[in-house]
Curated annotation (Swiss-Prot):
Pfam families found in the cross-reference section: Peptidase_S66, Peptidase_S66C
A GO BP entry: proteolysis
Cellular component annotations (GO), alphabetically ordered: cytosol
UniProt protein name: Putative carboxypeptidase SCO6489
Its EC number(s): 3.4.16.-
Species this protein is from: Streptomyces coelicolor (strain ATCC BAA-471 / A3(2) / M145)
Record family assignment: Belongs to the peptidase S66 family.
Keyword field contains Protein biosynthesis: no
Stretches of the chain forming a coiled coil according to its record: none
Amino acid sequence: MRELVRPARLAPGARVAVVAPSGPVPEERLQAGLDVLRGWDLDPVVAPHVLDRHDTFDYLAGTDADRAADLQAAWCDPAVDAVLCARGGYGVQRMADLLDWEAMRAAGPKVFVGFSDITALHEAFATRLGLVTLHGPMAAGIDFIKNARAQEHLRATLFAPETVRVITSGGTPLVPGRARGVTLGGCLALLAADLGTPHARPGARGGLLCLEDVGEETYRIDRYLTQLLRSGWLDGVGGVLLGSWAQCEPYERLRPLLADRLGGLGVPVVEDFGFGHCEGALTVPFGVPAELDADTGTLTLDRPALCSPG
């Protein structure tokens, strides 16, 4: 798996666009998130349709065309240094094919942040733009608004990524050992749903795969993992990092399933790595070569997630 292009780190005064590719955004949470960004001396701008709600499908932040237009306009605006998603939910799969990927590639690299439903965009940005992205807190997310650890880890990644090149999670080994690879992954359900789509990568070979999910029954997690196994998508994966399983069954019931489905891969697996739908979620860059030490619960990036400007 190849290393991807790193966008430039942010500096004080950088303009960041907030977009909503998925679900509708509560205005009060958006405003609170904007206040956090302003407190970092950033200049946040809100895309035109962020507060929209679809007339028929109220789980969408407006129409597919409007959500895609907001993301593309923000990405192609030369004054914008970073694009932050407001929240997840559902909707990226509906709008991803409406994006003009050639125009977005021509606009050059910039920082992209999000998680959950945004997993589909992490995959598309990797396959279509060849770009490092950040799996991290979103601008209108409760954890981002209220949790100092989530805020500070994202802030350090954006402004001083060399200070968080070693990500220490406190995680423990499900399968001990060390592994090297290029980071990738996100929400398990979205990775399974992405198979066979125009922006899906052929597999996780040579990768350090990050997996998490929210609100799923254990049998569904079994189904998603089994689909990835049967399709060959997990063939040759270097190691696995397991994040949070919020609103799923108690972990003592889920853990045997994860061991059953992933233990046969013969690679290190670390659990409770502290990313995803959890309190104080860590920011994990995707597309960066790294070493996983499952025994110590650390991920050491070969180089900072974002490069120096110029």
